[in-house]
Amino acid sequence: MNTAIYSREKFNQLPVVGIIRGMSIEEVMDILPLYVHAGFTTIEFTLNTPDVESIIKYSLEQYKGKLNIGAGTVCDRNDLDKALKAGAQFIVAPIVNEEVMKECVALSIPVFPGAYTATEIYKAWSLGAEMVKIFPATSLGPAYIKDIKAPFNQIKLMPVGGIDLTNCLDFMKAGSSGLGVGSQLFNKKMIQEKNWEQLTEQFEAFANKVKKYLQEVD
């Protein structure tokens, strides 16, 4: 297990989790320098990505101290063991699995379980979630985040799914503590064509928009 520790301070500098799914280690090698340079501090590699263990290990070797590096799509204990063996500093799940959550809490590994209804969200939080992942976020939009925060103002929410430059601040203003962004950030066409200049512009536009908002509300 990796000894590097997840940094909440680093996450809060730019509370966006970039979600990488299905990329090769070569693509990750090309993308991460641009991602870090834009100011992002947290990255998630989903476990259904081929050779994800090597990707996580490479990222830790190259970006330890610069990035929070986590594993996503962790659904059961076997997935958790795989993620922790690779060195994941935090865990993201699409569901609430009590065994996974209790083990993460026992090991002081931040866990972001997926939930949707008020009951699921409260259960996830009560089991020790770092934040509760709201997925799919676009189905009910920012208004749903605001509605959930009304009775549960103490619960930190991280919407995931369909978040892009046009709506990211709407979710933040509704009360989100963080955002999870995948394909809207890691444009597949740009990556396949190795259009690093355009991808850099996209990274910087997203990062700067969220940073500016945080400065305004600080």
Name each model feature, range by range.
Residues 1-86, 106, 166, 193-215:
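Conserved N-terminal beta1-alpha1 strand-loop-helix module at the mouth
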Residues 15-17, 42-44, 66-70, 89-90, ...:
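Structural preference for beta-strand elements that scaffold enzyme active sites
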Residues 94-139:
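Histidine/lysine/aspartate-rich catalytic loop segments that bind and position anionic ligands
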